[in-house]
Amino acid sequence: MTRLVLYLICIVFASSCVTKSINKVNFSLPPQNSKELISRVNSNNQPSQWLALKGTVSLFLKSDSEVSLGISIRVKKDSIIWASVTAPFGIEVFRAALTKDSIYYINRTNRTYFIKPISNISKILNTDIAFNDIQQILAANPKIVKNKYSFKRTNDNFMLTASDYIYTVSNSFRIISGVQIEKGISLIYTYSNFIFENNFPEQLEFLVKSPSQNEFNLTINYSKVVFGQEQKTSFKIPKSYVEAE
């Protein structure tokens, strides 16, 4: 019995020592280097288990034409990204779902569908991007990629710069913009108007620039943001639909 008591005391003592050794992030003091800034950003931007977004999406083509439609996005952390795009009067144009393994897509206008490996996203956008990247960008909490960064403070923001990554961070430690450069292709995302709950942005602009391909420029303006509520992510392919090539 005495040995058991001593054992429990040792566990409690060891646990308290571990707890004391954890350095809490001090948000009251401005960061002095890249390591301190990254620590604040990652601690300040924790993803919700569920996220529901509603708004309008605009796709800008290189020919300067613009297509604007309604959009609803539902994200279950590390599981699924579901999206429905609608024309005026709420008529669904297409529905898509991304998992860590696959892309599911239904086109209502021509009654077609496809199911492809998630790696096809990189081919569609002509840049290296994975499920986790898309999830973090949509949830407005992208992680700063491990690298050696130069640190700079401007009037209201901070900048982290490396050879292939650039981040602009607000004084509330939210990422305002990120740039990833690989093989001459730039993937750029920008957030603006942090007006919603949890300091969530009103607008996301996503741009892929390539010297040899057409630009992919997409802007989403959110009108409604819901955190932490379980959402339906139904995806049923009608039997009459034909598989697209």
Which residue stretches match the model-derived regions?
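N-terminal leader/targeting segments and the immediate start of mature chains
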Residues: 17-67, 242-245
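C-terminal low-complexity, charged extensions that often adopt amphipathic alpha-helices
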Residues: 124-127, 132-152
